[in-house]
Design a protein with these regions (language model features):
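N-terminal alpha/beta PP-like core and its mobile active-site loop of ThDP/TPP-dependent enzymes
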Residues: 1-330, 334, 392-395, 474-479, ...
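Active-site diphosphate/adenylate-binding microenvironment
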Residues: 4-7, 22-25, 30-35, 348-445
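Active-site nucleophile and cofactor-binding loops and adjacent substrate-binding regions
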Residues: 22-24, 42-52, 67-74, 129-130, ...
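Thiamine diphosphate
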Residues: 95, 103-105, 109-110, 305, ...
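Flexible, glycine/charged-enriched surface loops at secondary-structure junctions
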Residues: 151-153, 331-350, 357-361, 551
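Short beta-strand segments
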Residues: 155, 400-402, 553
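A short, charged, Gly/Pro-tolerant segment at domain boundaries
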Residues: 157-162, 342-353, 557-560
């Protein structure tokens, strides 16, 4: 067989049906046989978007996909999405065609050190050293991505294609996930059995490992509140009486108040990243004297950010099952009714407040939000918009959220009954995630309604994909764009620490993304009231069934929520002083 046939046959062995990228000569020998192999090549407008589409596809389906691009400048466009997928624990196949071996090191056309480029962004990488090893290496890279729940890279010199090799296809070797050590399981079960106020923190590992039912059994046995990890609102059913919402930035105040009372925390399937447990609503809620049981598939992340009493390296589902089996018969009985009452009261109070919360507060000594309300009295606030959106969303919807102020304000609102319903940029935090990732989700789940969210700044980064999704073979989506004509997160920083000296924070109010959508052959809608917003959301989700993609511009006032990095910002101090008069004229360098 040829090397490209060997490559594609391994893809078929693993059921990889979708590839995302921009066509390039360095991999045309394999893309040429994609149609015959049952592999769909989604030709995107930009490689960065292609990688984020792949992230959305895999996270919404649990199935691997592949990203590929031309060597050199095409491959460099994949840096942001691959690092995003790494911190989202998304297993992706990264295929990097390389400049030809015979010219490497000569500074040839489109040459770059592609292995070095991704070495800190993938769980495994390998270069094909000989054409006869094409299938072997690809099979191993795919297996490593699955085991590591992260992207893995195969680097292929382009002169290794179109060669005939006499090989057999390698076998697939799937390893069973580990369930942790017996001693650690016993310790965890004993701590939870004797706890007065146990709390479960449900993370990404619960979604990835399919452990929601096991988390429910534990929670119900213990009558413990269940907090969802930051950006993992789909890691526990929102309608469950013990679900108290997400921790982290703009999350659930109820979750923060309840976890602060914990004497034992079961952090299930989470690396406890530091940003997701920062103080919120003025509450420094992480329970510093509690016993912490951390469960993570990756042993290197246990105890990395928090003091841990018991660390368990293992699959969230298997670990939760074993802990449940080891609980004492009276586990959870201590103060059970008192705890149940407190959960109900705290949760009810927060939901009541959230349902009537219309506006953002100003820090003492600042007036930006007050002035924003007065300046645009007829416009919705971000919170009013989010409530209107919630009222229009179908129950089984998949949503993706970009990074940014208006999207972040929405963290406390969406709840889900099933996993793989909530896509977010994760801790790498790239702007421009919301639009491409929801395209990937719809490709993977064509019969499910989907809605993407982005601010007008973040949307501008990925808006070129409008030219892709307008084509007839692309599925229909709904994309919501919050229009407040500013880079909100950075503007919030400016109002708090830089005396409203706005540099680079303003966006063009004359630009209409709805009109851009119309020009692309898509449907553009502009809404200005809560009623219009709810109606547009409902209509657009119905229109998806008819193959109609809708971009909804939601016109907002310029209120700004809590800053992302209050922990990292401070008022600057001027020492030497800066004056325009000190700027020297620069002569052209060739003079």
């Amino acid at each position: 067989m040829t090397t490209e046939e060997a490559f594609v046959k391994v893809l078929q062995m693993h059921g990889i049906e979708h590839a995302f990228g921009i066509i390039g000569s360095a991999f045309m020998p394999i893309s040429d046989i994609f149609p015959d192999a049952g592999i769909t090549f989604w030709d995107v407008a930009h490689e960065t978007n292609g990688g984020l589409i792949a992230d959305g596809y895999t996270r919404s389906t649990g199935k691997m996909s592949m990203v590929i691009a031309q060597n050199g400048p095409g491959i460099t466009g994949l840096v942001t999405p691959i690092k995003t997928a790494y911190w989202n624990h998304t297993p992706l196949l990264l295929v990097t065609p390389q400049a030809a071996n015979k010219t490497m090191g000569q500074g040839g056309f489109q040459e770059v050190e592609q292995m070095n480029l991704f070495k800190d962004m993938v769980c495994y990488q390998e270069e094909v050293r000989d054409p006869s090893r094409m299938a072997e290496v690809l099979n191993r890279v795919i297996e490593k991505a699955i085991r590591g729940s992260a992207p893995a890279q195969i680097n292929v010199p382009r002169d290794y294609w179109t060669q005939v090799v006499d090989i057999e296809l390698p076998p697939i070797v799937r390893l069973e996930r580990q369930g942790g050590g017996a001693e650690a399981i016993n310790k965890a079960a004993k701590l939870l059995s004797n706890a007065k106020f146990p709390v479960i923190l449900s993370g990404a590992g619960v979604v990835i490992g399919g452990a929601i039912e096991e988390a429910k059994k534990l929670a119900e046995k213990l009558d413990s509140p269940v907090c969802s990890g930051y950006q993992h609102n789909d890691s526990f059913p929102g309608s469950h009486p013990l679900a108290v919402g997400p921790l982290g930035y703009n999350g659930s105040k109820a979750a923060m108040e309840l976890i602060s009372k914990a004497d034992v925390v079961l952090a299930l399937g989470t690396r406890l990243n530091p940003f997701s447990t920062l103080p919120g609503y003025g509450i420094d809620y992480w329970p510093k004297s509690a016993s912490i049981i951390q469960v993570d598939i990756n042993p290197d992340r246990i105890g990395l950010t928090k003091k841990v009493t018991v660390g368990i390296s293992g699959d969230a589902k298997l670990v939760a099952q074993q802990i449940f089996d080891k609980l004492s018969s009276n586990a959870g009985d201590i103060d059970r009714q008192k705890r149940k009452d407190l959960i109900h009261q705290t949760k009810s109070a927060w939901l009541q407040k959230l349902s009537s919360l219309d506006h953002e507060d100003d820090d003492e000594g600042t007036v930006w939000n007050k002035e924003a309300r007065e300046r645009d009295k007829d416009r919705m606030s971000p919170r009013q918009a989010w409530r209107a959106i919630q009222a229009g969303m179908p129950e089984d919807v998949i949503i993706s959220s970009d990074i940014g102020n208006n999207c972040a304000i929405g963290n406390a609102y969406p709840t889900f009954e099933k996993p793989r319903k909530y896509l977010a940029p994760g801790l790498f935090g790239p702007c421009g995630y919301g639009f491409p990732s929801i395209l990937g989700a719809k490709i993977g789940c064509p019969d499910t309604p989907v809605i993407g969210f982005a601010g007008d700044g973040a949307f501008g980064i990925s808006m070129n994909e409008m030219s892709s999704c307008a084509r007839k073979e692309w599925p229909a989506i709904t994309m919501v764009i919050f229009r407040n004509y500013q880079w909100g997160a950075e503007k919030r920083n400016t109002t708090l620490w830089f005396d409203n000296n706005f540099v680079g924070t303003e966006l063009d109010p004359e630009l209409s993304y709805a009109k851009v959508a119309d020009a692309c052959g898509l449907k553009g809608v502009t809404v200005k009231t809560m009623e219009e917003t709810t109606s547009a959301i409902k209509k657009s989700c119905e229109d998806q069934k008819k193959g109609i993609t809708t971009f909804i511009e939601v016109i907002l006032n310029q209120e700004l929520g809590e800053p992302f990095r209050r922990d990292a910002m401070k008022k600057p101090v001027r020492v030497a002083g800066i004056k325009k008069e000190d700027m020297k004229k620069q002569a052209a360098l060739n003079n």
